[in-house]
Amino acid sequence: MYLVVVGVNHRTAPVEVREKLSFSDHQLKDAFSALLSYPSIDGSVILSTCNRTEVYVASLDVDTGLKVVREFLANWAGLSLSDIKNYTYNYTLYDAVHHLFRVASGLDSMILGETQILGQVRDAFLKASSLKASNKILNTLFQHAITVGKKVRTETGIDKNPVSISYAAVQLACSFFGSLKDKKALLIGAGKMSSLTAKHLSYYGIKEIIVANRSFEKAEQFAREFNGIAVPFAKIYDILAEVDLVISCTGAPHLIIHKEQLELVIGNRQHPLYLIDIAVPRDIDPEIAKLPNVFLYDIDKLQNVVTKNLEERKKLAEMAENIIETELKAFIEWHSTQFVVPTIVALKKKAEEIKQKELTKALNKLGNISEREKNIVCALAHTILNQLLHTPIVKLKQYALTPQGHLYTEILQNLFDLQVEGERPKNFTHPREEMEESDEKRSYCGESR
């Protein structure tokens, strides 16, 4: 089997094209059914997010795999094959492995190092598995990719420093309070930036989100989405007297919160008020920063943090690329030795059959012996067998990485007259389950490998 991926993302296609190529959860069953109806496709995983759609397949042939996936996407989206070729990118074989490792690590995302994509890769794999669309090689690939994504984040910390204004605002709020779990926040505005901010606040466990917007209907809709409270725009100053945090992002051409009016309502506050203004033009009067127990941060201060963090992420991305290269080599080494696995399975099977046959003869000749003596004989046979097989198996795996690997495999098969079933030396397969099965507990003498 050969690995092929065809994808579209925010860099290659506009949103009106990406939305046609997206897959909702309830569409996946039909999508996989269509893909797997092609004789050349043995397995598939579909990764579909806001900014990307990628179709991974295990195909009998690279060129056929590319052709099939493009045809499938064209039919799905109602686009021409020419459009699909223009808007998509593709990777095959180990380039596809390298690409998925980068995707899972957040290095191919719109926001460098973002964390959400790793969960999306995991979900895509689990959905494909639950629908029985994936196969052995795709299972191994995605499991490895998820491990790589975790390793990159653990060893580099690339996801720690915020590189979006909304996330930076919430991180700043966390630095004020330590925890948001007993805090109330007022969001002024109900647009995209406020929505992102609300998601981050919810993630960090904010006690309550209050939203004010000039359109009260939109404020109510926003509040329902985040389990918050909507208030009329005219009530902003009343709310300012009770909240701990204000994050404002409207499209107003003038100030929303003025120093004189705020001063009138916060006189009896016993705790500080933090205001973060991420609007351009500004929503909050900069003179407010002069009030006692009031702390104001504007978008320029946040942008400085974001710029600095983005530069840091770029440095960490270089470390991440090194990790990915190391993991890619490990994957290639694993895959390059897979053609010897059926031979190893056959060797173990034949050796086990000989062991069991000779043990039966020996135990029959020994007659009535104790269970302890029987176990000693079985253990001896088991140890001799393992020690005899260990070196040939290790050497064969080593030779598999050389140009003579197939020759050594054939020599071993001939020397031991092995019957190797379903051997496909150059295929992109993963017969690990067969190895595990051969290593299971043996019925005779209660031995296990």
From Swiss-Prot:
The organism's superkingdom is given as Bacteria
Q: Which keywords, in A-to-Z order, does the entry hold?
A: NADP, Oxidoreductase, Porphyrin biosynthesis
Q: Name one Pfam family in it.
A: GlutR_N
Q: Where is this site: Important for activity?
A: 99
Q: Which GO terms describe its molecular function?
A: glutamyl-tRNA reductase activity; NADP binding
Q: Where is the active site?
A: 50 (nucleophile)
Which residues participate in NADP(+) binding?
A: 189-194
User: For this protein, what is the EC number?
Assistant: 1.2.1.70
InterPro entries on file? 4pyrrol_synth_GluRdtase, 4pyrrol_synth_GluRdtase_dimer, 4pyrrol_synth_GluRdtase_N, GluRdtase_CS, GluRdtase_dimer_dom_sf, GluRdtase_N_sf, NAD(P)-bd_dom_sf, Shikm_DH/Glu-tRNA_Rdtase
Instruction: Give the pathway annotation.
Output: Porphyrin-containing compound metabolism; protoporphyrin-IX biosynthesis; 5-aminolevulinate from L-glutamyl-tRNA(Glu): step 1/2
Q: How does it assemble?
A: Homodimer.
Report the protein's function. Catalyzes the NADPH-dependent reduction of glutamyl-tRNA(Glu) to glutamate 1-semialdehyde (GSA).
Its UniProt domain note says: Possesses an unusual extended V-shaped dimeric structure with each monomer consisting of three distinct domains arranged along a curved 'spinal' alpha-helix. The N-terminal catalytic domain specifically recognizes the glutamate moiety of the substrate. The second domain is the NADPH-binding domain, and the third C-terminal domain is responsible for dimerization.
Q: Which family does it belong to?
A: Belongs to the glutamyl-tRNA reductase family.
Q: What is this protein called?
A: Glutamyl-tRNA reductase
Q: Which organism is it from?
A: Carboxydothermus hydrogenoformans (strain ATCC BAA-161 / DSM 6008 / Z-2901)
Q: Which gene encodes it?
A: hemA
